[in-house]
UniProtKB/Swiss-Prot annotation:
It comes from the Bacteria. Belongs to the glycosyl hydrolase 9 (cellulase E) family. This is Endoglucanase A. GO terms for cellular component: extracellular region. It comes from Bacillus pumilus. It is an enzyme of class 3 (hydrolase). The keyword Hydrolase applies. GO terms for biological process: cellulose catabolic process. The active site is at 101 (nucleophile), 419, 457, 466. Keywords: Carbohydrate metabolism, Cellulose degradation, Glycosidase, Hydrolase, Polysaccharide degradation, Secreted. Strongly inhibited by ZnCl(2) and by EDTA. The gene is eglA. Active on carboxymethyl cellulose and carboxymethyl cellulose-RBB but not avicel, xanthan gum, carboxymethyl-curdulan-RBB or carboxymethyl-xylan-RBB.
Amino acid sequence: MLIFETYLILFKTVQITKRRIERRRLRLLNQCFTKKEGVSNREMASYNYVEVLQKSMLFYEAQRSGRLPESNRLNWRGDSGLKDGKDVGHDLTGGWYDAGDHVKFGLPMAYSAAVLAWTVYEYREAYEEAELLDEILDQIKWATDYFLKAHTGPNEFWAQVGDGNADHAWWGPAEVMPMNRPAFKIDEHCPGTEVAAQTAAALAAGSIIFKETDASYAAKLLTHAKQLYAFADRYRGKYTDCVTNAQPFYNSWSGYVDELIWGGIWLYLATNEETYLNKALKAVEEWPQDWDYTFTMSWDNTFFASQILLARITKENRFIESTERNLDYWTTGLVQNGKVERITYTPGGLAWLDQWGSLRYAANAAFLAFVYADWVSDQEKKNRYQSFAIKQTHYMLGDNPLNRSYVVGFGQNSPKHPHHRTAHGSWSNQLTNPPSHRHTLYGALVGGPNAQDQYDDDISDYISNEVATDYNAAFTGNIAKMVQLFGEGQSKLPNFPPKEQVEDEFFVEAAVMHNDTTSTQVKAVLYNRSGWPARSSQTLSFRYYVNLSEVFAKGFTEKDIQVTAAYNEGASLSPLKVYDASSRVYFAEIDFTGVVISPRGESEHKKEIQFRLSAPNGSNIWDASNDYSYQGLTSNMQKTTKIPVFEDGVLVFGTLPDK
């Protein structure tokens, strides 16, 4: 056994050494290329690509739904969507929220997972070098675990959780969503080929990248991938005909043939079985004969990705030529029907396809260019495609006319107001309140500028300033490639992410409504503005402390003081309780136990009470000036630490009187 273990260690050491030598060789080759292209050493490594990669992956952690593990690194994220699937009798918790909303749309989620897995398939060594391989696998596994849950039968898959219309009508953190979250499925009676085949691709690609570290899990993924692909192939139908709720958000514009090609390719790569390659090639024949070259890979259309993989696998000219037409259109342009056609370029050099997520499309095209450049033997094409991908990536990181990063939490003047409900952290169902985000959504790539390089960091702009799992997928791969090219000597940030400083989450604002020698009336509002993470509570209370020295001096006791309410939104009031008998300090407890106070709406996040402490009529023994909780109060509402707040009996805000 010892001999075997020693051999295994030596074998792994040799493999690691070989990988390092190969990475060094690639770097030297690519540095030669970049110098030929006129790119200086300073420009080549003008960013810490390992840091960008580290942050880009953290974005997926921020998108997690379900019960979060102990390893959760974001103190502003908590468990959410724990009842997902309950309406249909299945556990559909987990997965990723799609974008700045909280719907779990199956098609873009599966696409994002598949592309992320593809980035590991291509650039595993770069992730290893950055010491981020375990992390990217963990992020992908969060999605593939969910797909396994959602695949409840060979021909049954839950393609969506959450109603897009209801979800988009509310603005607040995922942890306190108020709406019902229905689940929608596809099956043999109402199929959805796009989602089934795309998920099969994600699971098949996942099986490849997990095989080295967890063979049993990889085998499980592959089993489900085969079943889902068989389901997609046998029972064909447009998924939005069955999951109609997805139509306004993720309609299948390109149809399902591209997903059948894509899924077949990944199953072939995972199994090496010609059957799947033949199925993919057969599906190619069903694709429109006039292959488009003016678009790029997206959640809706994976043909542009598939043709690159098929070019590598089959070496057929039709796939090679189609791939190069597409990449030429995005780079230098190509002559079609006697005229040069080329993607629109902004004055600052962004390859600009569409306003809605302009950077997402440029990142996707860049990833395809990187992958193809790695394979093509023609040095001029290799240089051209790789140069394009590098420039597009650098544009996103800050090499643009605005000199700003489009990655949240990275670089110069990065976005501060992405269209993202949970990161914003509103407690009042308003995207304008608070005026600034409470949380940093590290690593998120925003939609991006218009065709004139103009961009406004506006939370309300979901076209240019939203984020999404598909936006970051290929972008993450591009950064991994940049690590491979230029990341030598770079390292990830230590102790990242930093723990956010927690603001006052629970507190009381109060004002004096009346005060004389017989009574004091106070208006108090108890707030739940929790955000680390946001959470509803039914066990909140606060205490109002008084000093009864003058009452006892006149021969009265705490039992002579009444505590009553003129206006009350659900609290119970206690008679005065002793706090420090020697100092004659007592308190009234205003207890909202059983009343839900939640940071999910203007009225829902706060509760008001107007209470009075009264001495016997005509006694004239009352003097509030020495009362602890009265200190600093005026006729205007203000936050006060002298009215402490408790949750389930534990102090969560304010200070107690000295004893």
